[in-house]
Amino acid sequence: MKSLSDRTQNIAASLTVAIDTMAKQMIADGKDVVSLGAGEPDFGTPAPIQNAAIEAIRAGKTRYTAPVGILDVRKAVAKKLEEENGLHYDASQIIMTSGAKHAVFNALAALINPGDDVIIPAPYWVTYPELVKWLGGTPVFVEAGIEKNFKIDADDLRKACTPRTKAILLNNPCNPTGAVYSKSELEALAKEIVAQDIYCISDEVYEYFVYDTEFTSAAVFPGMAERTIVINGFSKSHCMTGWRIGYDAAPAPIAKIIGKIQGQATHHPSNVAQYAALGALNMDKSNVHAMQAAFRKRRAYMLERTSFLKTKPRAPEGAFYLFAPVSDYYGKKTPDGKVIAGSIDFCSALLESKGLAIVPGAAFGDDTCVRFSYAASDENLAKACDRFEAFVKELQ
């Protein structure tokens, strides 16, 4: 047999997916496991969205659409971006995708040539570097640890840029850290992006989950609209993770290329999911406000329950994750003698001994921390925190 694709075989599997799958299998096997691994809201898809999908099915709207998506849906996305974000797009610049992850792939595929560098602030979402490598690019990590509030600045970006730099991949609000760039911080970054003449892929999927500041899109600043691809979707904001629907909003020449890519790949996202997204765009924000309130309360609870750590976690400004520093406990042993050498050992021992699944920071490029998702019920958060505290206090 001839060999398989080297490029594809070199892609690392998603550690967040692997941990979530492991936890679900343990639960299926009858084990007592609490999982705070997956970034998935624990609320149901709102009724208006369900009804929009049902009505589309009953009306026979189940055939092929244009590769870039249904025109009415793209018009509604453009309207949302205008009214909520101050961004000006024609419907032809919107490409509906099978989730925001697919939108990130489209953006990178449109931009990257072999040997191009893509700057990725670290910690980062696990998928970013793997997609860059898959497409022949080189991920260049710019460290932004807890001492920098998990954010890079214009000087960091300037130092990282070389003639090979094609783009920066910015996640704001950030998974896994919950960091949110203020308008002034983002404006300073935008000026440097323009000065360096690079592209910006701005993943804004957590835009509605901001606690302490106003959300600002990277594309709003002077010189940015023509070089920014905005990524967004409905999985987090409208509890539609399984529907797989998102979008790229791009400058016209890039949008045209993305349309070609999609036409030869998936053709288009699910017809029914697009109509469900239209229902989401047309409904009020009451569900979003309810989730914001719930996540704000859970954030406070998680900060209180993890305050015993030697290094206290930084309060997340957005999203629904707590990125907790645990490196103070590396080198210690579990009661059965296992040495905790890093975040992977920490999380493995925690799952094995206490039945709590969280994600090691190593998956996100920061081995000093672990990630909790607080998109879970109050009961499960309490159980998780009890188990986490017991585990840490048993380390010797």
Briefly describe each language-model feature range.
Residues 64-97:
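Conserved N-terminal alpha-helix of the aminotransferase class I/II PLP-enzyme fold
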Residues 4, 8-14, 19-22, 26-32, ...:
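PLP-dependent class I/II
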